[in-house]
Curated annotation (Swiss-Prot):
Family membership noted in the UniProt record: Belongs to the class-II aminoacyl-tRNA synthetase family. Phe-tRNA synthetase alpha subunit type 1 subfamily.
PROSITE patterns: AA_TRNA_LIGASE_II
EC id: 6.1.1.20
Domain of life: Bacteria
Alphabetized SUPFAM superfamilies for the sequence: Class II aaRS and biotin synthetases (SSF55681), tRNA-binding arm (SSF46589)
GO biological process: phenylalanyl-tRNA aminoacylation
Name used for this protein in its record: Phenylalanine--tRNA ligase alpha subunit
Keyword Secreted appears in the UniProt entry: no
UniProt main location, coarse: cytoplasm
CDD domains (alphabetical): PheRS_alpha_core (cd00496)
Keyword NAD tagged: no
Organism: Trichormus variabilis (strain ATCC 29413 / PCC 7937) (Anabaena variabilis)
Catalytic activity: tRNA(Phe) + L-phenylalanine + ATP = L-phenylalanyl-tRNA(Phe) + AMP + diphosphate + H(+)
């Protein structure tokens, strides 16, 4: 019996070493470990038959069994190290950057000049404590005109100046309508800035477009004066254009009283850049505010005009042409 069991152990060693050497994955190697050296493995099954042997035979077979176990374990360790090294090398080869290969061109994104002006302006006003407000581009006559103290016979209501829709609505001609809707929902104090796209029935040329962008600001509180308005505009224009001379000229807007145009001295000449004024009491009443308690100011400007001045653009149509040769300059 001893010689038979000894032969089985030696055959198991030879078979196991060959199988381990042929294992090509760590998963397969683990299967072989369990098969040969696990609790229910082949080596354990052979050793359980030692109970039938005499006391003199057991030490010899036990020594052979330990030798077989150590040999198989050594083969497992060696093959595991080899497979792990190969796995790491394969991963390194896959992730290695070949600096001799040509690069892949990735076009660099640019900020459109209109978006750049809007972002800069909003940053200034948000820094002053204003909240950004958005509104509808398709409006009713009430919010676009009537609530803003624009009477039915005002030239702005003319079919030649406004895009009227078949259902009686219109495309907003300014972002002032955002202010009315906001005031209807909120109580003073209010400090908002409203950017957005607006529409006018203008003939498209180098300085006019039927679609353009405005940014308007509104402040409502107790005790606000024209001095507060002037100070706010000066801070804003200095942030956008630098410390340049500005002036206020008397003007007229139906929704502000008094009203003014703001000029900026740019390259030796005065440029009209903004309109502004104190909110008309009739506008206050239309949203349920008491003009005896609250005062307010409003101002607005065209984003395209700012972009054309700051970037020295001679034709507003360039801003909408999607010409990459032009846009890559910004």
């Amino acid at each position: 019996m001893t010689s038979n069991l000894e032969a089985q152990l030696l055959a198991l060693r030879q078979e196991g070493e060959q199988a381990i050497a042929a294992a090509d994955t760590l998963e397969r190697l683990e299967e072989l470990r369990v098969s040969y050296l696990g609790k229910k493995g082949q080596l354990g099954a052979l050793l359980r038959s030692m109970g039938q042997m005499s006391a003199e035979e057991r030490p010899k077979i036990g020594a052979i069994a330990n030798t077989v176990k150590e040999a198989l374990q050594a083969s497992l360790d060696k093959q595991r190290e080899s497979l792990e090294s190969a796995q790491i090398q394969a991963q390194l080869d896959a992730e290695t950057l070949d600096v001799t290969m040509p690069g892949i061109y990735k076009p660099q994104g640019r900020i459109h000049p209109l978006n750049g002006i809007i972002d800069r302006a909003l940053d200034v006003f948000v820094g002053l404590g204003y909240t950004v407000a958005q509104g509808l581009e398709m409006e009713t006559d009430y919010y676009n005109f009537e609530a803003l103290n624009t009477p039915p016979d005002h030239p702005a209501r003319d079919m030649q100046d406004t895009f009227y829709l078949p259902d009686g609505n219109l495309l907003r001609t300014h972002t002032s309508s955002v202010q009315i809707r906001y005031m209807e929902k909120e109580e003073p104090p209010i400090h908002i800035v409203a950017p957005g796209r607006v529409y006018r029935r203008d003939n498209v040329d180098a300085t006019h477009s039927a679609v353009f962008h405005q940014i308007e600001l509104l402040a409502i509180d107790e005790g606000l004066t024209f001095t507060d308005l002037k100070g706010t505009i000066k801070v804003f224009l200095q942030a956008m254009f630098g410390d340049l001379p500005i002036r206020f000229r008397a003007s007229y807007f139906p929704f502000t009283e008094p009203s003014a145009e703001v000029d900026l001295q740019w390259n030796g000449r005065w440029l009209e850049v903004m309109g502004c004024g104190m909110v008309d009491p009739n506008v206050m009443k239309s949203v349920g505010y008491d003009p005896e308690i609250y005062t307010g100011f409003a101002a607005g400007f065209g984003v395209e005009r700012f972009a054309m001045v700051l970037h020295q653009i001679d034709d507003i149509r360039r801003l909408y042409a999607s010409d990459l040769r032009f846009l890559r300059q910004f």
